[in-house]
Amino acid sequence: MPRSSQSAQLAAAAAAGVGLGIIATLSFQRGARRVDDDEDGEDDHGAARARVWRSIGGAVTAAQLYVGDKLGLYASLKFLCETAYAATPEDLAFHAHIDERWAREWLAQQAAAGFVKLLPGTGDSRLRFRLKRAYADVLADPNHEEYDISLVRMVPALVQRARTALPEAFRSGRGVAYDDEDISRAIDDAHAKHIRLVLLPVVLGKLGSIVGRLERGGAIADLGCGGGNLVIALARRFPLAKVVGFEVSDTALAVARKRLA
């Protein structure tokens, strides 16, 4: 689709009531330009504004990534696009059990951000969107090696800390507690992928004689074990070794204990 036609359709979607998310995303995409630190001039206000707007646009988009992940919208889109190539807001609303108006808002924002494609020739009353296979793998398939949305789950918690805990922490010098369900889950899910795809098949193979010693016994300490994924994986890989995890987060420890039960 020509860029002018695509822009016109996105504008039509915005006019239909998609709200601040798409407007901010469009402004971010059109106004920001790539800026390298070495190219920033001392008085380059354009570069400074572009960097600010990239950050704002990223925050707005991350919030909608979080919503899509939490409500299973990407998983629903993946299923719909695999079975019918594309989906309407009505389709997504029905499959994901959400309100149609909010499905429309979210899809339009996702199209503006480039995560889904607004198909050409779709009128305002029958907008059709497609989640491409690569994006479906990254956003909606936890078993795929390219799956990579886990860490977005901690973004709202980190932003909330910026509103509440961090200003006082900066003034007082006191720390901020690590314990948070979303943060723990995000890190835990991200680690699970790398344990499965990198640590077990790649890293262990580079440890030489250490692997042999662990196969005969020995002890392993996982400092900052989180939800226990690595502790469990290593215990299974080295059943004769003693594997102990250490963690300060009560939330993460509760997950680890549940997995070990």
Put a short name on every predicted segment.
Residues 256-257:
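Conserved SAM-binding loop
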Residues 43, 49-71, 75-76, 104, ...:
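Conserved Class I S-adenosyl-L-methionine-dependent methyltransferase catalytic core
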Residues 223:
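Conserved beta-strand/loop positions that form the S-adenosyl-L-methionine
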Residues 7-28:
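Hydrophobic alpha-helical topogenic segments used for membrane insertion/localization
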Residues 83-94:
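Short acidic, hydrophobic short linear motifs in intrinsically disordered regions
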Residues 249-251:
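Conserved SAM/SAH-binding beta-strand->alpha-helix loop
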Residues 242-247:
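Conserved SAM-binding motif I beta-strand of class I
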